[in-house]
């Protein structure tokens, strides 16, 4: 018996097996769409933002 999941991008049923190399996505296209949404900050993990203090870092003096 195989398990099926919905593609997070398009909701198409995807068999959870070696036959579906892009799982949980139905395709590489849906995988890249999801990656783009994270990169554009359209998706995020819920919770309070974390502020990382670093006294050695000064944005104005950075060479990068």
From Swiss-Prot:
The gene is yacG. It comes from Idiomarina loihiensis (strain ATCC BAA-735 / DSM 15497 / L2-TR). Zn(2+) binds at residues 7, 10, 26, 30. One of its GO terms (molecular function) is zinc ion binding. Binds 1 zinc ion. Keywords: Metal-binding, Zinc. Inhibits all the catalytic activities of DNA gyrase by preventing its interaction with DNA. Acts by binding directly to the C-terminal domain of GyrB, which probably disrupts DNA binding by the gyrase. It comes from the Bacteria. One of its GO terms (biological process) is regulation of DNA-templated transcription. Interacts with GyrB. This is DNA gyrase inhibitor YacG. Belongs to the DNA gyrase inhibitor YacG family. It holds the Pfam family YacG. Its cofactor is Zn(2+). Residues 44-64 are annotated as: Disordered.
């Amino acid at each position: 018996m195989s398990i099926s999941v919905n593609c997070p991008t398009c909701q198409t049923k995807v068999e959870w097996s070696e036959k579906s190399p892009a799982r949980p996505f139905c395709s590489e296209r849906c995988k890249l769409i999801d990656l783009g949404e994270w990169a554009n900050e359209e998706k995020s993990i819920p919770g309070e933002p974390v502020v990382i203090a670093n006294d050695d870092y000064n944005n104005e003096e950075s060479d990068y």
